[in-house]
């Protein structure tokens, strides 16, 4: 890759040397996140003592207040007071940003962010969009914390007082301006601009064939009121050369250090004619929605190029270089291109497609999206709803300053179209340019929606550009602007009435759902498809291995045939189910899916080597064809239309509906039971939800720790029928306590560090043991029964035992007898002791408890040492077939050396009668 612009040297022109001088290193005193993220400019100037004299302060504030007559006229023409009112309205119901626990242990841990933002690239770097309903709720102006973010790496820690921008290259008067000089010496402009990531709606492309980009949904778009200095004024001050003098491009370079091309800054460029065109309103912005920029959006200064993709708007701007050539930044060439559909990554690199100028993206294309109805929204069909129309809503935008002139909606696949009502809240600039999105709406009859199989939207701009019907795939997944379609299906909600449920094409990030995901599941298998493509995870097809499509793998998701994908390889784990230490559910929960991340999170190197014995082939993908119509709708009459309605039977609202989906939960209470034991209470997504965890099963707690997914199994201690929350009792294994484990417990320490309000994910249920009540168990699907239970636990292994005790005692008709032997290192290590002894005291005939500790205090009245045959014979029943079962959860040495041999001596068949969690 070419060297970065840092290393460029320019010839002397008119006696001025233009070799690059490195910019000053910003002060290590970083911009204080707590005090300065949202302060107004005059406060910052005062506190950082940028200016010393009253006269200078007055000049700065006057410039900030737009006191010049030209600026006043411009502000009046742009309707700035109206936009400022919209900013206030938009921010009125916005919760404060927080230091998100997900940013701990990253370089961005100092940045406050809105916790509702959907992260698209994991923990770091921060790339995020707002939930679509949330974005639309705030209206024309997007609150800054909900504005989409595209970061390539860590956010630079900037200081207003020592930040400067260097203007160099083909200019007569190279200069370096501080922030104070920029705002005091140049006029400013303030107007709204809609920013759009070129990857907006990319996940739809990834559903067809994986691109090299991550999964943007349809909220990679936001609108703010931006204030800054016109770029043309700065270049004019510095004496930019003419085209004849070689000044053809204006390059921008940011401050962040990135890995691309072996190490570089983020940089890009635009043509000189664009940079100098006053009609284009290009500014160096230092304010957003009336406040200084926040770190994620480029504090202290960034480029705003209205009507262009976000990739041209360099944040944390440090240098402007006027050159004959385009920017030679790695990111200028290896990003923001729309290559022909035939070009894959290998071809793009080998044939230098990245460097062909005709494929660079600058101006946005025309686009529109349906935002109402939302995904999974249900419209009831009844006497009330059918008496009034339903209002479809959405947004539309175009690029280059072109006005969106028409939005149309079709309910019949494009045979007929209805023209929507447009809401343009923006006044054009004096050159007639429009830089913002507009909103559209259309009233439709509910019965027309009932007979439609889908709803699609397309927009037109003043140049009569419109959106294509079908998706056009490209390697980077950019500029996707095909008709936005939502599918409709008839359902029957639990109240018994008919309803229409709406499905958007995708959901952002790694969230499951959307009709395109369903279509992908219905792809024909690789054996009958002639159009085989290379897998993203296996760039070169291995002809020695059998190749399987994702749709073929998805069929193998049962105990009879359990396949998984790890790093693009296919493994048949069916014969390993019965031997898996974590039980069959741990495999079945991921059967038929790509579980690379989960597998890496919980398996050792030994397990990874063992997996190779089960490898059967490699993953491919198939060419995309539209699947058969799976809608229940027909358009002719309502007789066949309603025939296949799916009955949604009344059921409890439970969180763990799909064991493969992660459920976000929020920490609402943390109690210290002892120096190293905590009780955590997490709120479920809905206040009226039950967890839905069968007795005997457990959940995975999922967290990103040190940039890696970490999964740990926990059994909740909350009641099975608890509503709105889940309780976990966790022993915290601190680092530098146990010599064998100097780093301590990764997950337990992470949970202990979480502040109230933090979010984690859980998934489940999993586990091979389920207690069905009245002595009945299902073990890997096979029934077992006992009147008496020997319940043997070590350390934190008490939690699944606790769960079963709780369930049995909550049922007055369950007469199962329970005999608990609970081993720990010391008396202080005994978990949930108060609850256990309270139950034992209240239910003396049904529950008996005995403790064993390795180290005892004086006066200890239970056993000391380890679990022995004598302890077991005295405190649990003999092993009698059909009468007794042993349940065990604890360290492997306890089970292998203390329990199994001694239980055998007591008549237990350890293969059949010992149930190990």
Curated annotation (Swiss-Prot):
* Superkingdom, natural source: Eukaryota
Residues involved in Mo-molybdopterin binding = 197
**Catalytic reactions on record:** nitrite + NAD(+) + H2O = nitrate + NADH + H(+)
Q: Name all FAD-binding FR-type domain ranges.
A: 660-772
Q: In which tissues is it expressed?
A: Root, leaf, and shoot.
Q: Which cofactor does it need?
A: FAD; heme; Mo-molybdopterin
Q: Identify the enzyme class.
A: oxidoreductase
What does UniProt give as GO cellular component?
cytosol
State how the cofactor is bound. Answer: Binds 1 FAD per subunit. Binds 1 heme group per subunit.
Q: Which UniProt keywords apply?
A: Disulfide bond, FAD, Flavoprotein, Heme, Herbicide resistance, Iron, Metal-binding, Molybdenum, NAD, Nitrate assimilation, Oxidoreductase
Keyword Iron in record? yes
UniProt GO BP: nitrate assimilation; nitric oxide biosynthetic process; response to herbicide; response to light stimulus
Q: Which Pfam families match?
A: Cyt-b5, FAD_binding_6, Mo-co_dimer, NAD_binding_1, Oxidored_molyb
Q: What further fact does the record state?
A: When mutated confers resistance to the herbicide chlorate.
Subunit-structure text: Homodimer.
Please state what the protein is called: Nitrate reductase [NADH] 1
Q: Which organism is it from?
A: Arabidopsis thaliana
């Amino acid at each position: 890759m070419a060297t970065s612009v840092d290393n460029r040297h320019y010839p002397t022109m008119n006696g001025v040397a233009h070799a690059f001088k490195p910019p000053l290193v910003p002060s290590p005193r970083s911009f204080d996140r707590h005090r300065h993220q949202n302060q107004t400019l005059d406060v910052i100037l005062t506190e950082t003592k940028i200016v010393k004299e009253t006269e200078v302060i007055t000049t700065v504030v006057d410039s900030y207040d737009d006191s010049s007559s030209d600026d006043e006229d411009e502000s009046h023409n742009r309707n700035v007071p109206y936009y400022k009112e919209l900013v206030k309205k938009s921010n009125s119901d916005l919760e404060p940003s927080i230091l998100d626990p997900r940013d701990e242990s990253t370089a961005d841990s100092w940045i406050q962010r809105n916790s509702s933002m959907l992260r698209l690239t994991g923990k770091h770097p921060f790339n995020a969009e707002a939930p679509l309903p949330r974005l639309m709720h705030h209206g024309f102006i997007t609150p800054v914390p909900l504005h989409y973010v595209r970061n390539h790496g860590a956010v630079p820690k900037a200081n207003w007082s020592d930040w400067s921008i260097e203007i160099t290259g083909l200019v007569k008067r190279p200069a370096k301006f501080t922030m104070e000089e920029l705002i005091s010496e140049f006029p400013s402009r303030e107007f709204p601009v809609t920013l759009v990531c070129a990857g907006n709606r990319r996940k739809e492309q990834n559903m067809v064939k994986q691109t090299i980009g991550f999964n943007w949904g349809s909220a990679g778009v936001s609108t703010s009121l931006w204030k800054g200095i016109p770029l043309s004024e700065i270049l004019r001050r510095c004496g930019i050369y003419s085209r004849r003098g070689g000044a053809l491009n204006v390059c921008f370079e940011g401050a962040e250090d990135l890995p691309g091309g072996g190490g570089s800054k983020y940089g890009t460029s635009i043509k000189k004619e664009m940079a100098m065109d006053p009609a284009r309103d290009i500014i160096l912005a230092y304010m957003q929605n009336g406040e200084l920029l926040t770190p994620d959006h480029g504090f202290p200064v960034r480029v705003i190029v209205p009507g262009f993709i976000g990739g041209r708007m360099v944040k944390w701007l440090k240098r402007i270089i006027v050159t004959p050539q385009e920017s030679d930044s790695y990111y200028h060439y290896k990003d923001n291109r729309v290559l022909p559909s035939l070009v894959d990554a290998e071809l793009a690199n080998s044939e230098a497609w990245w460097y062909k100028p005709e494929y660079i993206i600058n101006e946005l294309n025309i686009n529109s999206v349906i935002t109402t109805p939302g995904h999974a929204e249900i419209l009831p069909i009844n006497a009330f709803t059918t008496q009034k129309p339903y209002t479809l809503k959405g947004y539309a935008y175009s690029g280059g300053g072109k006005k969106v002139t028409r939005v149309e909606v079709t309910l019949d696949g494009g045979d007929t179209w209805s023209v929507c009502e447009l809401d343009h809240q923006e006044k054009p600039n004096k050159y007639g340019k429009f830089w913002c999105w507009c909103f559209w709406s259309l009233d439709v009859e509910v019965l027309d929606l009932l007979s439609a199989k889908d709803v699609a939207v397309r927009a037109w701009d003043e140049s009569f550009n419109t959106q294509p019907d079908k998706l056009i795939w490209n390697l980077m997944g950019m500029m996707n602007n095909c008709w936005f379609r939502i599918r409709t299906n008839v359902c029957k909600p639990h109240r018994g009435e008919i309803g229409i449920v709406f499905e958007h094409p995708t959901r952002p990030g790694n969230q499951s759902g959307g009709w395109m995901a369903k279509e992908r599941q219905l792809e024909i298998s690789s054996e009958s498809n002639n159009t085989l493509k290379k897998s993203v995870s296996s760039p070169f097809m291995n002809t020695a291995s059998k190749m399987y499509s994702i749709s073929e793998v998805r069929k193998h998701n049962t105990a009879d045939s359990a396949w998984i994908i790890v790093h693009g390889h296919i493994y048949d784990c069916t014969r390993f189910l019965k031997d898996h230490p974590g039980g069959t559910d741990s495999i079945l929960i991921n059967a038929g899916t790509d579980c690379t991340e989960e597998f890496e999170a919980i398996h050792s190197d030994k397990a990874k080597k063992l997996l190779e014995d089960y490898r059967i082939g490699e993953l491919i993908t198939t060419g995309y064809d539209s699947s058969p119509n799976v809608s229940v709708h027909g358009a002719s009459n309502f007789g066949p239309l309603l025939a296949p309605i799916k009955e949604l039977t009344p059921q409890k609202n439970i969180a763990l509906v799909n064991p493969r989906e992660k459920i976000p939960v929020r920490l609402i209470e943390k109690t210290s039971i002892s120096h190293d034991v905590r009780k955590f209470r997490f709120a479920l997504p809905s206040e009226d939800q039950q967890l839905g965890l069968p007795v005997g099963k457990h959940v995975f707690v999922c967290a990103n720790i040190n940039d890696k997914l970490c999964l740990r199994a926990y059994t909740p201690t909350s009641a099975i029928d608890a509503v709105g929350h889940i309780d976990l009792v966790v022993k915290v294994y601190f680092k530098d306590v146990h010599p064998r484990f100097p780093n301590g417990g990764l997950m337990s320490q992470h949970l202990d560090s979480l502040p109230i309000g933090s979010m984690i994910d859980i998934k489940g249920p999993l586990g091979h043991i389920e207690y069905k009540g009245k002595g009945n168990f299902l073990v890997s699907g096979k029934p077992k029964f006992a009147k008496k239970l020997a319940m043997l636990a070590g350390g934190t292994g008490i939690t699944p035992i606790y769960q079963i005790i709780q369930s049995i005692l909550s049922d007055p008709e369950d007469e199962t007898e329970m005999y608990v032997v609970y081993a720990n290192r010391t008396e202080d290590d005994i978990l949930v002791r108060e609850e256990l002894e309270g139950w034992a005291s209240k239910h003396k005939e049904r529950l008996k408890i005995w403790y064993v500790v390795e180290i005892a205090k004086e006066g200890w009245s239970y056993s000391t040492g380890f679990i022995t045959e004598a302890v077991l014979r005295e405190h649990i029943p003999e092993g009698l077939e059909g009468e007794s079962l042993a349940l065990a959860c604890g360290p492997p040495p306890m089970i292998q050396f203390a329990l199994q041999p001694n239980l055998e001596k007591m008549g237990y068949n350890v293969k059949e009668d010992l149930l190990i969690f």
